[in-house]
Amino acid sequence: MLNDILTGYGIFILEILTILLLILAVVGLIISYRQHNKSKVGELEIKDLSEEFNEQVRLLRDFNLSEEEQKQRTKAEKKAEKQNAKKRKEKLKKGETLEDEKKACVYVLDFCGDISASETTALREEISAILNVAKSEDEVLLRLESPGGIVHNYGFAASQLSRLKQKGIKLTVAVDKVAASGGYMMACVADKIVSAPFAVIGSIGVVAQIPNVHRLLKKHDVDVDVMTAGEFKRTVTVLGENTEKGKQKFQQELEETHKLFKQFVSQNRPCLDIDKIATGEHWFGQQAIALQLVDEISTSDDLILEKMKEKQVLNVKYRLKKSLIKKFGRQAEESAINIIHRYSTKQSRDFMY
């Protein structure tokens, strides 16, 4: 009886130890993996859009074919592939290169801009990678969506696109929804701007809106001292008293920023009547083409389909690593934006039919 109890107890202890060892092994693997990838900020993902499209075409094409017809078509395709592989092999045996068979590439990038142009971090990595491999016959297509934001952030994003032009790589920007203000600052760098008919284009202006609660605080006997060294270190503030001189200086700074904005657009699109379009107004795509803000009316989808006829189309995306907290934070932010958008849509009919 005692032997049975001891045997059972021993087996129980062994099971517990086995489970603990397995847990420790899993934890060790996780720690090792994290340490291995700790230095990686993100990673580059490349998707062959041409191959994806061809696969979709095959599926639709074969849908109405009989089983026998599908077999014959598949057999013919495999035969053609074998013949091409044989020809390539023979060329390599003769010491010839296959460079003449390689198609030129269209690298498709995506930029969805927020007020801080935060996707610039990924954009700079994508462009750096492309510049290391691109040839003169290759080109870049940027699918851009941005209503603008902070001046220096969008200036930096536009500078990243300028790197492509400096290296002689053709850049096309496709705007399906909006490229306004800082978004248009980026778009104007392109060799060609393609816009959807009702995409919002333009808004070449500068805006600043600052609330001031000084009188409210004063009413409740609350003093706020704003201490500065330098006459215009703080032109206007939220809490302190704003002087007329400070307001005038702030307005002057806005005008100077607007002047630089206009100069940048004029340098990249000299065809524009800058005084006519740099009023802060925006236009829909089909109006913008008459003002030469864009070069063609189309969508990014049609543009990509057209490029696929003669070039290999690759989607390049640099994905930044995010912690679990940041992922949840991003989801919460997107949910809040969607709620605000739904509410504002109910309250306003602007740009709605």
Swiss-Prot record:
Active site: 181 (nucleophile), 233 (proton donor/acceptor)
This protein's record includes keyword Transmembrane helix: yes
Region of interest (Disordered), residue spans: 70-93
Pfam families, per the entry: Peptidase_S49, Peptidase_S49_N
Regions crossing the membrane: 11-31
Any one GO MF annotation of this record: serine-type endopeptidase activity
Cellular compartments annotated: Cell membrane
Major subcellular location class: membrane
Enzyme nomenclature, EC number: 3.4.21.-
Keyword annotations from UniProtKB, A to Z: Cell membrane, Hydrolase, Membrane, Protease, Serine protease, Transmembrane, Transmembrane helix
Biased segments, Basic and acidic residues type: 70-84
GO CC field: plasma membrane
Highest taxon of source: Bacteria
One BP annotation, GO: proteolysis
SUPFAM superfamilies membership: ClpP/crotonase
InterPro entries: ClpP/crotonase-like_dom_sf, Peptidase_S49, Peptidase_S49_N_proteobac, S49_SppA_C
UniProt topology in membrane: Single-pass membrane protein
Job of this protein: Possible protease.
Similarity section: Belongs to the peptidase S49 family.
Protein's recorded name: Probable protease SohB
Organism: Haemophilus influenzae (strain ATCC 51907 / DSM 11121 / KW20 / Rd)
Gene name of this polypeptide: sohB
